[in-house]
Each structure stands twice: as structure tokens, then as C-alpha cells.
Amino acid sequence: MPISEEHVGRSYPATAPYEVSRAKIAEFARALSDPDNPAYAGLDPVAPPTFAVVLASAAWDAMFADPELELSLSRTVHADQRFAWHRPLRAGDAVQAQLKIEKVRARGATAIITISVLLSTTDGEELCTATSTLMHTNVEAA
């Protein structure tokens, strides 16, 4: 059965810890064409806000691997993204990501799926909630 409102509330185990490093922060800042931003350099850099996507998208793997949902990344469009921050990601943080399905709406052959991914340290400190809206075309319409 494809993803439906019945799946709202389903959550998946947290990802393996990801250690945020100065090198990865610098690499991401270069990809944003912002390598000279002092916030992203030095001895205690913070990660650019959108770096959270690196961690949040890793949590998507469990949802897309769930055979009951019949999801395929090749039939999915990332329509919206929001972040609610408690504090910035810093070099040295060991971060886990846990995904929860918040809302599912059907519009014809398309499922509009809202997911939240809670990023927290391995010590349980909540860092950020990344909320995404995905549009997925079901198999029968593909």
C-alpha cells in the first residue's frame, strides 16, 4: 500500500552519529561560495545553517527503504524546507538524525508528505528540527 495518512506519526531509528568537523564545515562553506565567512573558520567554527540538510537527508534513507510506503527517490520532488534552530552545529558535535512522518495528503496520484528530522547530539541535546515537504508520484501514475 503506498504512503497514506495511516503512516502519519511513523518514526524511524536515529542515524549513526555524524561528527561535524572543521574540514566538512569549510568544504560546505566553499560549496556555498562563502569560504571567507569568519563564522565558518577558526578554532570554533559553526556550520552554515543549511549544513543541517547533510544530516537530515541521511535520515531519509530509512523512510525510502520502508517497503510499506512504496517510495522512490526518483519519483520525489523536494518542495519545501524549513529549519527551527536551538543552537548552531559546531565542529566536534556528534549528531544523530531521527525522522518522523508528520503529514500525508493525497492529490490525485501525488502524495504530499511532510516530514520532520530532529537533529540532536549523542548526549540528547536538541540542535535543530528540519521540516521538509516532499511531493511523491505513486507507481500507478508513473
Segments (PLM) and residue ranges:
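Hot-dog-fold acyl-thioester-processing enzymes
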Residues: 1-80, 141
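HotDog/MaoC-like acyl-thioester-processing domains
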Residues: 1-3, 85-142
